[in-house]
C-alpha cells in the first residue's frame, strides 16, 4: 500500500513554514492520540502517520530529501538490498542523477519547469536608520518573465511542443553495461519542450534581464547580519514556474559616537578634572537628542553610567536596551603659566599626611609596589 504524501497527511501546503507544520501536527496529534481514542485502531494508525510526517518535515535534511525524491528519499530500507530480476534500474539511478540534470522523472511524468533563483541584496544602513526603521527604495537587477510571450518562450500565437526524444521528461536513459543512468536530453537540453518558433524578444528563453524598483520596509531595531525575506521577488521561474525570493542582507555602518551591542548602546563621554572632583551635570548625546547626566562628586575616570531605556528597541520583542556612558577624565592641555602655578599650589595641598585621604587608589598602589620590592629583596 502506497504512503500518503506527508504534506497531505498534515493538511499543509508544500511551502508551509515550520511554524505552520508544528501547528498542524499539534492539532492532528491531539485529535488522533490513543489516549483520546482508546481501542480505535484507525485513530492509532492516523496518529503514527501524523507523527512520521512531522518528524520528516521538521528535520531540514530529511525534508530536503523528501522534497527532492519523495518517500524514496527518506526510506531507510531503500538501496540496502539486492535488485529483483524485474527491477527498473532507471528508477533507482534516475532519482539520484536526475536532479543533477534538471529534475527527476517523478514517476514518468513530464519535467517541471524550474523555480526562479533566489536573489540577495546587500543593504548598508546608518545606525540611526537601523534603530528607527524606514522604507527604502531598492533597485534590483533580475530576470523577469518576458511580457511578449508571457514567459512561454514561444512567439505569440504559438506554443511549445513536447520533445519527441524524451517525451517531455527532459532526460534520456543511457545504459553503460550493468548500470543505467539519466542524462539531459540532447534535443531539448533538459527542458522537455521544443520551441519551434521562439519569441523575438527573449529568443525562446521565456525571461529577460530587467531592473525593478521595490519599496522595502526595514523594521526598527535591525542589526548587522539580519536578513529580510521578500517572497516571490526573486528571479522569474522558468517558463511560468514560480519565482524565487529576494533576501535583503543588512549591514550597519560604524557610528562616530555609539557602539552597539545587542540592544544596548555604549559611548565615552569626556569630563573635566574639576567636574569629576566636584560633581555636576553634563550633556550626553542619545539617539533621541541630548539629555543631562548627573555626575556625583569624586567620580573616577572609567566609571560607567546606565541610562535605562535609551538604547535600541528589539526587532523581535517590545524590550528596549540601555545607553551606557563611560566617563573619561580629560587632562587639560596648553596651560598658561598662571594655570600651571595654580595646579602646583593645588597639588601641594594634596601631599603630606592627608594624601591617602585624597588619593586612596594611588597610595594603595604605591604601598603595594613598596611591599613588592621588599619581598623581592628579603
UniProtKB/Swiss-Prot annotation:
It comes from the Bacteria. The keyword Chaperone applies. InterPro entries: DnaJ, DnaJ_C, DnaJ_domain, DnaJ_domain_CS, HSP40/DnaJ_pept-bd, HSP_DnaJ_Cys-rich_dom, HSP_DnaJ_Cys-rich_dom_sf, J_dom_sf. It is found in: Cytoplasm. SMART domains: DnaJ. Residues 5-70 form the J domain. GO terms for molecular function: ATP binding; heat shock protein binding; unfolded protein binding; zinc ion binding. CXXCXGXG motif repeats lie at residues 146-153, 163-170, 185-192, 199-206. Binds 2 Zn(2+) ions per monomer. Disulfide bonds: none annotated. Its cofactor is Zn(2+). One of its GO terms (biological process) is DNA replication. This is Chaperone protein DnaJ. It comes from Shewanella sediminis (strain HAW-EB3). The gene is dnaJ.
